[in-house]
Amino acid sequence: GGIIGGGSGAAAGAIIGGLIGKGKGAAIGAAIGAAVGTGTGVAIGHKMDKKAAEAAKIEGAQVEQVTDANGLPAVKVAFDAGILFGFNSSALSNDAKASLRDLAQILKDDPTTDIAIIGHTDKVGTYEANVKVSKNRAYAVENYLQSCGVSSAQFKKVEGVAYDQYDESKTAAQNRRVEVYMYASEQMIKNAEASN
């Protein structure tokens, strides 16, 4: 595994506060409606740095530090081969399950971490069929993480975006993936504000 865009607590890479799936989804992380103070952002940034470092130790994990809808640091985790799916399949491989068990431990350690899961497909077949497959992939990951003890309350968004975010620089097999986002819940934000 490895961290892409890793840095200090408040530093972040790509912005995910925008819409996922070219307008077909809501922003990652519900906006809390009030400005978050710098101290709160730094505190959450340190938590997310720790989560990113832990996730980077997972075999095959690609970890990227991103920003949520509140402008706070968040973490995106995808896998080289662990959560790649066969053609038209949402079945998790044994390697995928092993990686997800490790990720589940990170998620269980802090129940104030919210989770979004986004499923993706290649471009073979109809768009409608790919939407269904991408949703099934996201739900397969959610269900497996829950079977590993992650609280259902942590899952705030689970969706499939088919090939709306197809990466032309990758192979079709690499585009058959699921991305897991870890970001601050409203409770994590309140806890960070209270400690400042």
Language model feature labels by segment:
Residues K47-K76:
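Amphipathic, membrane-active segments
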Residues G60, D68, D80-G82, N88-S90, ...:
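Solvent-exposed coil/turn segments that connect beta secondary-structure elements
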Residues L84-G119, Q146, V180, Q187-S195:
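Periplasmic peptidoglycan-binding/anchoring modules of Gram-negative envelope and division proteins
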Residues H120-N191:
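Periplasmic OmpA-like peptidoglycan-binding domain that tethers envelope proteins to the cell wall
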